């Protein structure tokens, strides 16, 4: 499987608010996890162009990440700018 518990812990440790492996609820850690999943699905769709169910799942993930980014932008702009810079996302 592409997303093992070790990979998730590493993502949460490097991107969460508390910088711990158990910080799974902060918007930063969820955005980082969604970004990892989006990158994986994008690579899958480059090979399998007609996989429309995966394409639908990818669009839903992008929407979830966008909503979390909008939430961070409205509540704490400094955390929003930090996660955008850290993950190299464009707005």
Swiss-Prot record:
Query: Which GO terms of the cellular component aspect does the record hold?
Result: cytosolic small ribosomal subunit
Q: What PROSITE patterns is this protein classified in?
A: RIBOSOMAL_S15 (PS00362)
Domain of life, per UniProt, equals Bacteria
Q: Which InterPro entries match?
A: Ribosomal_uS15, Ribosomal_uS15_bac-type, uS15_NS1_RNA-bd_sf
- Which keywords does UniProt give here? Ribonucleoprotein, Ribosomal protein, RNA-binding, rRNA-binding
One GO BP: translation
Identify one Pfam family in the record.
Answer: Ribosomal_S15
rRNA-binding is among the record's keywords: yes
- Any transmembrane segments, and where? none
Gene3D superfamilies given for it?
A: 6.10.250.3130, S15/NS1, RNA-binding
- Which terms does the record give in the GO molecular function aspect? rRNA binding; structural constituent of ribosome
The UniProt function text for this chain reads: One of the primary rRNA binding proteins, it binds directly to 16S rRNA where it helps nucleate assembly of the platform of the 30S subunit by binding and bridging several RNA helices of the 16S rRNA.
Q: How does it assemble?
A: Part of the 30S ribosomal subunit. Forms a bridge to the 50S subunit in the 70S ribosome, contacting the 23S rRNA.
Q: Which NCBIfam families match?
A: S15_bact
Q: Which family does it belong to?
A: Belongs to the universal ribosomal protein uS15 family.
> What name appears for this protein in its UniProt entry?
Small ribosomal subunit protein uS15
- Organism, scientific name: Cytophaga hutchinsonii (strain ATCC 33406 / DSM 1761 / CIP 103989 / NBRC 15051 / NCIMB 9469 / D465)
What is the phylogenetic placement of the source species in the record? Answer: Bacteria, Pseudomonadati, Bacteroidota, Cytophagia, Cytophagales
Gene symbol here is rpsO
């Amino acid at each position: 499987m592409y997303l093992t518990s070790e990979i998730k812990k590493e993502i949460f440790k490097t991107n969460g608010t508390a910088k711990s492996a158990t910080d799974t609820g902060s918007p930063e850690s969820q955005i980082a996890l969604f970004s990892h999943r989006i990158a994986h699905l994008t690579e899958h769709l480059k090979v399998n162009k007609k996989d429309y169910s995966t394409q639908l799942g990818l669009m839903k993930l992008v929407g979830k990440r966008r909503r979390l980014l909008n939430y961070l932008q409205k509540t704490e702009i400094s955390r929003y700018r930090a996660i955008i810079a850290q993950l190299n996302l464009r707005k």
